[in-house]
Amino acid sequence: MYLAVTCSPTKGVDETMELSEKLIGRGFKVTPHIASKCVSGEKHLDRIIKKLDELGIESIFVPGGDRPEPMGDFNNALDLLRALKKLGHNLNKIGMAAHPEGHPDVSNEVLMEALEEKKDLADFIVTQMCFDAKILNDWMVEIHKKGIELPVWVGLPGVIERGRLLKTSLRIGVGDSLRFLRKKSQVATELMKSSIYNPDDLLKDITEQNDINQTNLAGYHIYCFNQIETTEKWRSDTISALI
C-alpha cells in the first residue's frame, strides 16, 4: 500500500518532499504528487529527481496541480512527463490523472486526447472521484477500446463529513454525479439520516457493472481528505469482510 502525498498550490513540491521523507522514516511507502504547475523548470525538476533517488522513492503521481498559473515552464502534466523522460530517472511507477466525468475547465475531447498523449509516458492512472458507477464503467470501456492499457486505480471518497464532501466535489467538477447521487433514493435516505458519507454503496454499484471487470481496473485509490483514522478503519473492515 502506498500513501499519496499531495502537493499544495501554496506550499509546493518541496513541502511534499519533506512530508514524504518523514513518512518514509516511519516505515511507509509513499507516492508524492509532483504537480507540474508547482515545478519552475528543468533545473528544479532535476533537483526533485535527485531527491527522489536519495529517498529511494520509486513511485510518483503527476497531476497538473491547482495553481491558477504555472510557476514556470510546465503548463500541464504532459509537459512535465516529457521533461522527466528527457532528464532520465530511476522511477518504476509514474501515475497520471484522469477524469471519467469530465473536468469543469476542459472538454471531454481534450481530456481524452491528453490521456492518449500521456499513455506512453506513464505507468498507471488514478481517476478523480465519480459517484455514478455507469459513467465510470462506460469511460473504462472507452479508454480500453482506444488502446489505453494502463492499470486504472479508481478514485473513491473515504469516510468523510457530507458537507465537506459536497463542497470538495463541486469544486473539482463532479457535480453531475452528485446530482445522480441525490436522485438515488437509497443513498439519499442514507445521506439524510447521517452527516457522514460512507462509500459502501458506491463500491457495490461499481462491482456490479457488467463490463468493468473486462477493463484494466487495478483497484481503488481512497481520497481520505485527511480523515485518516475513519477511512483506514473502513478500508480494513471492508478487506476483512472479503477474507
Predicted ranges, named:
Residues 1-110:
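Active-site beta->alpha loop and helix N-cap motifs at the rims of alpha/beta catalytic domains
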Residues 4-6, 32-34, 124-129, 219-222:
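Short catalytic-loop micro-motif centered on adjacent basic/acidic residues
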Residues 24, 53, 118-119, 144:
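Non-catalytic positions within long, well-ordered alpha-helices that form the structural scaffold/packing
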Residues 32, 118-121, 154, 206, ...:
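Conserved, mostly hydrophobic/aromatic
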Residues 39-43, 68-76, 127-140, 162, ...:
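Active-site glycine- and acidic-residue-rich loops that bind
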Residues 73-100, 147-211, 226, 239-243:
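Active-site pocket-lining/capping segments in soluble small-molecule metabolic enzymes
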Residues 105-120, 125, 135:
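Active-site glycine-rich loop that binds ribose-phosphate moieties when present
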Residues 118, 213, 217-233:
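Charge-patterned, long linear interaction tracts outside catalytic cores
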